[in-house]
A protein has these predicted regions:
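Acidic ATP/Mg2+-coordinating residue in the GHKL
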Residues: 164
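Short conserved segments within the C-terminal catalytic ATPase subdomain
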Residues: 102-112
């Protein structure tokens, strides 16, 4: 059918773009790694220092590769129909517990409030969304500051709000925050973390926004807000057995 052909064409375009972007992005850490190895072989740097630098480069390349695979997985799951219903609140609390050592390391005053929320989504998507947003907030929250997570439902949507007390974001940067591999994305390092979040939210027919909190003329922090639709309530429109008789 036309719908199937459109989905196949979309998938093919996405795969071509992914291969092009992936090859371009991996070229940089591989070039850096080669330079570091050559410097070590020539004795330009101390062996211990060279090993530390090489290890850091490998870690960055591994993170980048994993994030690119996550982007590809989002598209793969998007093509599947009828995702299961998943408790967003349970996933969110599990991720918060998972990164609690990072929160403690930065001595953050961390608070989390959740309400039961059932979302039509693969658990992996909600987990990846929560992990990327929380990691981003923890990394950029000033040590010893407050970081709050709030998940609430209004009956039609569930809203996740993550509020930090960091420096916020520049207006110029905000326009390209959710683009894969965006240059100058200082809040995500490789420029993929928020792009993954954006793709997941789009796949779930929701919205995501990053907004500076301002008091007077001073930025006091950043709010990351995700809104996802709740499943429509089931309606029994079929006739009962008694009515059929």
């Amino acid at each position: 059918t036309n719908e199937v052909m459109q989905r196949l064409r979309h998938l093919l375009r996405h795969q071509k773009r992914f291969v092009r972007d992936a090859s371009h992005q991996l070229r940089t850490p591989l070039a850096v790694l080669k330079t570091q190895v050559q410097s070590a072989l020539h004795g330009d740097v101390e062996p211990q220092q060279a090993l530390h630098e090489i290890s850091d480069t490998v870690d960055r390349a591994t993170l980048l590769a994993n994030q690119m695979l996550a982007l590809a997985k989002v598209e793969q799951l998007r093509q599947q129909s009828a995702p299961p219903a998943t408790r967003f609140d349970e996933v969110l609390r599990a991720v918060a517990l998972e990164i609690s050592p990072l929160i403690a390391q930065r001595d953050l005053d961390f608070g989390i409030h959740t309400e039961p929320a059932l979302v039509q989504s693969h658990e992996w998507m909600l987990r990846e969304l929560s992990r990327n947003l929380l990691h981003n907030a923890v990394r950029h929250a000033p040590p010893g500051s407050e970081l709050t997570v709030d998940l609430r439902s209004d009956g039609r949507h569930v809203a996740l709000t993550i509020s930090d007390h960091g420096p916020g974001i520049d207006d110029e940067l905000a326009a390209r925050l959710f683009q894969p591999f965006s240059a100058g994305d200082v809040r995500t390092g490789s420029g993929l973390g928020l792009a993954i979040c954006h793709e997941i939210v789009q796949a779930l027919e929701g919205s995501i926004a990053l907004t500076n909190r301002v008091q007077g003329h001073k930025v006091t922090g950043l709010d990351a807000v995700v809104r996802l639709p709740l499943p429509a309530p089931l309606t029994d429109s079929a006739p009962t057995a008694q009515a059929a008789q």
